[in-house]
Every structure is written in C-alpha cells, then in structure tokens.
Curated annotation (Swiss-Prot):
The keyword Membrane does not apply. Inhibits ADP-induced platelet aggregation and inhibits the binding of purified platelet fibrinogen receptor alpha-IIb/beta-3 (ITGA2B/ITGB3) to immobilized fibrinogen. It is found in: Secreted. CDD domains: TFP_snake_toxin (cd00206). Keywords: Cell adhesion impairing toxin, Disulfide bond, Hemostasis impairing toxin, Platelet aggregation inhibiting toxin, Secreted, Toxin. GO terms for cellular component: extracellular region. Expressed by the venom gland. A motif (Cell attachment site) lies at residues 43-45. This is Thrombostatin.
Length: 59
C-alpha cells in the first residue's frame, strides 16, 4: 500500500507501507494535517484519524 506522509501543506511525498490502511488527521493543538501509514485509536483528546484502504487515498 502506498500512503502520503507529508506534513501540512508541504509538497506531497509517499511511502510504501506494510499496513493495510493510510490515515489523515488534523491535530487540534497545532492545526497541522498529518498523514501516514496505518490506522490507530487516539488517546486522550486527540482527534480520530480518517482512515482508508487504497493506494494514495489519504491526500
């Protein structure tokens, strides 16, 4: 699976993942969009990530 992994509004970069999903989320404390491999359950007051299961689905 290929996922985007750039921070915020930087030019898109990708990575090949061993996971079966990609995520995209906006962190509330700094407003920065984060992207990467996998899907996880957030702790505390972190926002829930948007997860998807196809190549480059987290732009």
């Amino acid at each position: 699976l290929i996922c985007y992994n750039q921070l915020g509004t930087k030019p898109p970069t990708t990575e090949t993942c061993g996971d079966d999903s990609c995520y995209k989320m906006i962190w509330t404390y700094d407003g920065v969009i984060r992207r990467g491999c996998g899907c996880f359950t957030p702790r505390g007051d972190m926002p829930r990530p948007r997860c998807c299961k196809s190549d480059k689905c987290n732009l």
